[in-house]
Amino acid sequence: MASLNSSNEIKSYQFKQMAFNKTTGGKKAKKIGVFCKPKAPSATDILGRLIPWLRKQNYHVFLDEGTAAIINETSSHEKKEIFQQADLLIALGGDGTLLSVARVAHPHNIPILAVNLGSLGFLAEISIDELYPTLENILAGKFEIENRMLLNACIWRNGEKVEDHNVLNDVVINKGAVARVINLQVLVNGQYMTSYRADGLIIATPTGSTAYSLSAGGPIIHPSMHTLVLSPICPFTLTNRSILIPDQSVIQVKLAAEYDDVRVTLDGQEGYDMRAGDILEIKKTKTSLQLIRGPNKNYYQVLRNKLHWGTQNDEDIL
């Protein structure tokens, strides 16, 4: 289990206990779980080439039901079984595909290779053209892991925990389309911080700082930083700005009054009702996500490419 102080470190990674080398004779083949966005461009062609290629390398491939259906495979596995068995996960799609896999896979400490099939892809930074050279390096044990922080979010209602989930990007509290400004009381480590009157509040990891939080005026945070960011959405008080707090903090957000429609959204994919008096408690998980880095890429290169920042010729750079 990763320590609380090492959740974002970049490190070289070798499959030690897994001995992720080709097997021969009667030895058991190593196991790779593959997940693909069903409506991704060219998903059928990509899987139709990838799966036979992996099997030819003598690796056992696990497909979930949705992925198997894309290429009409009759054999599929439950996601729980894949996470328990696999030595490596491949997520084909975009950031959304990775987020859905990561929330469940991270306690199992399985490295994930995220491949971008056409979307923005801050996290899924590996292109389809880079897939096979990257896989060859991975299967030879030559790659780097970037550990990404996750958050645990619980909703407490009348002293009882009614929801308990993990997120990679962010936890968002927001009002419905016709609801008025909501009042959110925020405590950090049991100490009262402030009350927000706003359309909502975003609590994001460094990974999530380039998602919804960025649109709300929050800062971009390097993944190695041990911090969380709280960003109010359209606050009534203009001095209510984004604030960074240590990642070992425990954040409690209380919905101070009754509103018609207030939701807690996790990574933009799952939503739950929040009622008057409910307390949303957020803290860092003990385990982190093991994300395989793209070849010859760094964080600033990804920012330049995805945010269309200005570039210079190599000879002009100091």
Model-derived segments and spans:
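Short glycine/serine/threonine-rich phosphate/pyrophosphate-binding segments
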Residues: 43-44, 96-101, 210-214
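Gly/Ser/Thr-rich active-site loops/lids in small-molecule metabolic enzymes
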Residues: 194-198, 202-239
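ATP/nucleoside-binding phosphotransfer catalytic cores, i.e., glycine-rich phosphate-binding loops
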Residues: 173, 189-192, 238-318
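Gly/Ser-rich helix-loop-strand patches that form or flank binding pockets
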Residues: 100, 105-115, 122
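Catalytic core of DAGKc-family lipid kinases
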Residues: 120-199
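Short, well-ordered beta-strand core segments
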Residues: 89, 112, 201-202
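Redox-cofactor binding/interface segments in oxidoreductases and associated redox assembly factors
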Residues: 34, 91, 203
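ATP/NTP phosphate-donor binding region
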Residues: 2-4, 8-88, 129-144, 155-165, ...
